[in-house]
C-alpha cells in the first residue's frame, strides 16, 4: 500500500471530522499491526508504533474489534472512559472519542482506520461516519 494514498485519505477524513489523529492498522495473525498514521504533536508515528509493539492488541481479546470484524460496520464511541466497549489501547494513547472504520475485502476485515480524538471529546455524527466510510472505500478500492 502506498503511504501517499493514506495521506490523502487521512487529510480528507480530518477535513470531514476536524479530528487530526488518524491511523491505519492491518489485521494480521489475529492482531493489529500499526501501518501508518498522521503525524501530530499529540501522538507521533514512532510513539504510536512503539506503544503498539509493547502492547499488542489481539482481535479475540478485544470486544470492540470482535464487534467490528463480525458486523463489518463503522463504530463510534463518544466517551471511551465510560463505554464498556473501549479497548485498553484507547487508554494507552489517551483517546477520549473514537471512530473505527473497517476495511473489508472478500467479506473479511483486513484493516481498520481509527479516527481518534485525544484530549477532547468529539461526537462523531452519522454523516461523518457515512462520509468517512465512503472516502475509505473510494481511496482503498484497489488495495489488497
Regions found by a protein language model. Give the residues of each.
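Short amphipathic alpha-helical segments
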Residues: 2-15, 129
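Short, hydrophobic-rich beta-strand element in sensory/regulatory alpha-beta domains
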Residues: 10-14, 19-34, 74
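Short loop/turn motifs at secondary-structure junctions and domain boundaries
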Residues: 90-95
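A short, aliphatic-rich beta-strand micro-motif
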Residues: 96-104
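Sensory-domain boundary capping and coupling elements
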Residues: 103-117
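Regulatory loop-to-helix N-cap segments in sensory/regulatory domains
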Residues: 117-134, 143-144
Amino acid at each position: 500500500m502506498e503511504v501517499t494514498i493514506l495521506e490523502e485519505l487521512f487529510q480528507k477524513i480530518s477535513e470531514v471530522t476536524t479530528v487530526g489523529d488518524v491511523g491505519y492498522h492491518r489485521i494480521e495473525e489475529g492482531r493489529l499491526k500499526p501501518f501508518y498514521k498522521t503525524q501530530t504533536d499529540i501522538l507521533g508515528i514512532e510513539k504510536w508504533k512503539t506503544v503498539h509493539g509493547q502492547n499488542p492488541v489481539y482481535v479475540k481479546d478485544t470486544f470492540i474489534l470482535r464487534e467490528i470484524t463480525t458486523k463489518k460496520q463503522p463504530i463510534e464511541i463518544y466517551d471511551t472512559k465510560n463505554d464498556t466497549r473501549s479497548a485498553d489501547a484507547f487508554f494507552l494513547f489517551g483517546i477520549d472519542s473514537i471512530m473505527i472504520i473497517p476495511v473489508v475485502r472478500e467479506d473479511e476485515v483486513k484493516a481498520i482506520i481509527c479516527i481518534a480524538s485525544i484530549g477532547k471529546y468529539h461526537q462523531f455524527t452519522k454523516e461523518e461516519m457515512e462520509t468517512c466510510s465512503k472516502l475509505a472505500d473510494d481511496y482503498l478500492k484497489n488495495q489488497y
